[in-house]
Amino acid sequence: MDKTLRETIKDIVKNHLNSGKGNCYGQCLTAVGWVGGTLPELYEEDGMIELPMADVAGGAIVTGAALAGDRPIYVVRYQGFQWYNAVSIINYAAKCKEMWGTTAPIFVRSISMNGGVGPVAGSSHHSIYYRMPGLKILSPMTPKEYIYAYETFMNDDEPYYISEHRKSYDNKEELENIINDTADFTIFPISITRLEMKKLINLCDSENIKINIIHQLWIKPFIPKDEWITSLKNSKFGGIVTDDDYEDGCIGSIANKLSIASNKTVYTLGLEPRTAGFHSNVDNLPPDAEKIINFLKVIKNG
């Protein structure tokens, strides 16, 4: 039976600890739920290190561990906490190789969550890391993608920001690109918006809108393939990049790169430019299939 993404992550962490490759650090790791069931039931003597509830200190501790020869997995239970966790990772771990020839490889498991989690904790925040040199960013939404991300990290010497989303943890399916000879739009979905694509295809079929879908695993470095650019050039109304982060962030940069390479208009659709509240009436959620198709219809109909 195929494993879920949740089970895949749990197996990776367990093997990482049991094989002596490194420790796992974070807050409330061994609390009820074991971070959404993505951690094995291991404890400090096994390498599961509980950090104090001081978010700024956590990033510094794992940076120090990496400099000392550990290859830490750092679990950040809500991506919004990266405003505190990122300081030492960005300003030391990501820069030390270029400046001093030392390395600090850290596997940052940064977990996004949407719906009623308020103005700080919710949504994805990979744009915080995106503009800084010396690190890589991936957003795996499938089991094979996560295995690839981990194995790539283990063969590298830089910090990796792994942008996860809790709503993907039950996923067992791999996500395949759909590229037609001609289309109205080419969609470049990132993070949890990728799991809206199956529903979006059905909605587009009912509205006679033809789309290409090119799933995005790598956020940084973003290197567009020739096939993607050809797909954009063959799309009547251009493309759109969707994400669970604000539009004034990495998706704006990615859309610009795609637009320059293809000479086509590439739009962005992410979080609205406002603060999320706890109540559903004031929440700020990533674009779902309905919101995406409404956006496409506005463009198509002029």
Sequence positions of predicted segments:
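Thiamine diphosphate
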Residues: 1-159, 163, 165-302, ...
